[in-house]
């Protein structure tokens, strides 16, 4: 049985420089997917310069990169997903519903979304509408 390995993100550590170095030195094709540290959509509907650098396809050439998004707002998730697909060519996006940070959870983001199943259902219904 073959194991599938995914590289989990860690904010401030696993940016494109880390992902590329890890793949070159250790991964060598063994890592199925590398997840980016989360992008947190903003009301301006634009990515920050550091986010653009991290998700730029040229900076992730040759490694299967999945962009992680942290939001509890379906509209923000949808515009982010569209932009990642249309402008950056990503066809897989990951919703962060697991971050246990107190700051994140207090905003009902990350694992905080799991505390409110009805809100999570509403979010997912809107995304997949």
Where are the regions a protein language model picked out?
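Non-cysteine beta-strand/loop elements that form the S-adenosyl-L-methionine
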Residues: 36, 92-101
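Extreme N-terminal starter segment of soluble prokaryotic enzymes
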Residues: 1-5
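Surface-exposed, active-site-proximal loop segments in enzymatic domains
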Residues: 101-116
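Gly/Ser/Thr-rich beta-alpha loop segments that engage phosphate groups in nucleotides
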Residues: 10, 14, 100, 112
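Glycine-rich, positively charged N-terminal anion/phosphate-binding segment
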Residues: 10-83, 87-90
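General structural feature for long, well-ordered alpha-helical segments within catalytic domains
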Residues: 6, 18, 76, 80, ...
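Alpha-helix-loop-beta-strand connector modules within alpha/beta enzyme cores
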Residues: 56-64, 113-129
